[in-house]
Amino acid sequence: CIDSLDTYSKRLYEKYLLRCIVGQTRDIEKRAIESNESVYDTIISAHTNLGELIALRPGEKFDIDKELIDAINSITNKETKLMKTGYGSVDKFSGGLTRGEITIIGGRPGHGKTTFLINLLSQMIHSGLKVVFFNRELPNSEMIKKLITLESGKLSYGMVRQGIYDDSEIDELKRVKSKIAELYNEEKFLMFDNIRDFARSSTEVSKFKPDVVMDDYIQLVQPSGHFDSRRLQIEQLVNDYKWLAKEHECAVVLASQLNRSVEYRD
């Protein structure tokens, strides 16, 4: 009953705010048509009136007691948001990937960003975690060839890419095919090479609800609007990914190409 009352009260208050908006817009329209004041004074007045409506929005609640209890319970129950990367040196200093946070892998072309992500992907899948991988640069077919090389340990990438095998290597290829089909099934792994923008990427994350999201690489994501500089575009994308990580309680790993200017710093 209390929940129903709270819901009804919230809806009633929202209806009141909508009526206020209608009233304010009528006043703004009337003032714009009939007033002899300058257009800038009219704009300032409209901005002020709408700002007053924004102030009527109920504030967000923060319960320190609840947050403290949740934190203590998490500690005592040894619950953790960390996921091991499989890289000992990384796990030693960071503990691994963290749910609700992003990790950015930066490097110049050819420095192994994609290779690092593929190894990280393998570690996550072998740990039983769900992963979404966005390929902005390579087609899925090439990524699969890299996975075959990684999961085999016997077949080289050049061999797989060129299709040069003998009978024993064909047997190994069949074995790896079965292994990958079992491990990287559609319930645990999705990979896209045809999604250009963040909005569609976010939609796929919302539907799949992964533990880890990987994006290789973010400079190739199509911007959602106009930006005065590439830097502002990347900042907005990183912010969008930060909120996505928090909303879905997943870890996000982004590969990013470093600006050449870093090579000339003192």
Give each language-model segment a name.
Residues Y217:
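Walker B catalytic acidic pair
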Residues Q233-A255:
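Substrate-engagement module of ASCE P-loop NTPases
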Residues K92, H126-K209, P223:
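Cytosolic-facing regulatory segments adjacent to core modules
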Residues R161-Y165, P223-E235, R265-D266:
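Flexible beta-alpha connector loops of hexameric P-loop NTPases
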Residues L220, R260:
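Residues immediately C-terminal
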Residues C1-I75, H111:
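Short, small/acidic-rich helices and loops at N termini and domain boundaries
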Residues M214:
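Walker B beta-strand of ABC/ABC-like P-loop ATPase nucleotide-binding domains
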Residues G59-K154:
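The Walker A/P-loop phosphate-binding site
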